[in-house]
């Protein structure tokens, strides 16, 4: 494996954006595979398990960690998989301390067409049909200074569009 960790992203655009940030944060880490999971449907959970097994076969000696919504909603089942070396809480996945990394801010990942800035995450509603609150937790917003810092970083990297 190279010095760039493999981050496998399943699910929504927010997961894709978070995966890019994790990849930038973990630059230089070797022999690491992260599965950023989804749990929005039963099929998404099945695909998460499949991605975990596939990642282990492709990287038998790498440390394989799982984060994301399925790592929250299916915590016991995912942790019991023999392929999995550990779980990182969804709420902590962008915190370098959760990965035993230095707390310096990572550079914004380079984007080809658009950069993503998540300003709100989670949900305070308890709709019977939705698993988002269990996977992402209660609603919380990024402080405006952090939003501006992230936008500035993307602009410095040459992002032509910010979503």
Model region roles, listed by residue range:
Residues 1-163:
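Proteins enriched for Cys/Gly/acidic motifs involved in redox and nucleic-acid/cofactor modification
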């Amino acid at each position: 494996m190279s010095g760039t960790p493999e981050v496998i992203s399943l699910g929504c655009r927010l997961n894709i954006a978070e995966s890019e940030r994790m990849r930038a944060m973990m630059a230089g880490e070797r022999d690491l595979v992260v599965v950023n999971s989804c749990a929005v449907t039963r099929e998404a959970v099945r695909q998460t398990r499949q991605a975990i097994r596939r990642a282990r076969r492709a990287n038998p000696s790498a440390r394989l960690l799982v984060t994301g919504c399925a790592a929250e909603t299916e915590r016991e089942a995912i942790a019991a998989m023999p392929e999995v070396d550990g779980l990182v809480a969804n709420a902590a996945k962008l915190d370098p301390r959760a990965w035993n990394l230095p707390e310096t801010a990572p550079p914004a990942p380079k984007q080809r067409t658009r950069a993503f800035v998540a300003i709100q995450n989670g949900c305070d509603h308890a709709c019977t049909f939705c698993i988002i609150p269990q996977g992402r937790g209660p609603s919380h917003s990024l402080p405006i200074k952090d939003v501006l810092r992230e936008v500035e970083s993307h602009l410095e990297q040459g992002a032509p569009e910010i979503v």
